[in-house]
Amino acid sequence: TYAGVTSFMRRRYTRDLTGVDLVVSGVPFDTATTNRPGTRFGPRAVRAASITSAWERHWPWEFDPFDLLATVDYGDCDFDHSQPQHTPAAIEAHADRILAAGCAMLTLGGDHFISYPLLKAHAKKHGKLSLVHFDAHSDTWPDTDEGTQGINHGTMFYYAAKQGLVDPSRSVQIGLRTTNDDVMGFQVLDARQVHRSTPEQIA
C-alpha cells in the first residue's frame, strides 16, 4: 500500500490533459494565514492518506467513480514562497491552464486564501459563480488597505463578491459561528441552525 509514487488515489501523475475530465492538483501555500501555518503540507498529507483507500471498493456505490471520470494528478502549483505578492497570479495562471484544456478541478490546499485566485480563473471561464462555503468564518472581512489587495485568508470572499466573481444571492455559507458586520449578501446557515437541522433540511 505504501510503496510507489504518492499520487492522489493512485491516479496517474501527468501534465498531459488529453482526454482528461478531472484534474487533481495541490497549492501548498499558507503564507496568508494570520495565526497557524502548516497547511502548505496539506496536499502532500491528503495524497498520502488517499492511497490507503485507493485499492478498496468504492462503498456504498456500485460503481467506480474513476470509470466515469478520467482523473489525473497534475502535481502542485509552482510558485516562489519568498515572493508571496506574486503567488495569486501564479495560482490563477495554474488554474487557467487546466480550465483551458476543458477539465474540472479538485484542488488541495493550502490556506483559505487560495480560493480567491481559483475563483478568478473559474469566473473567467464560466462567468459569475455560485458558492457553497463550509466554514466557521465568513471570510468576507474587508482588507485594511484595499489599494494593496492584501493576501489574507479572511478577505477572499469579500473580494470575490465585490469583484463579481460570485453571486452572493445564489451562494450559501454553512456553519458560521463568528460575527461579521457585513456578510456581503451571502445566504448564511449559522452553526446553531446546522446543529438543529438534518442534512436533508440543510440541503
Model-flagged regions — what are they?
Residues T1-A203:
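Conserved alpha-helical scaffold segments that buttress catalytic/binding sites
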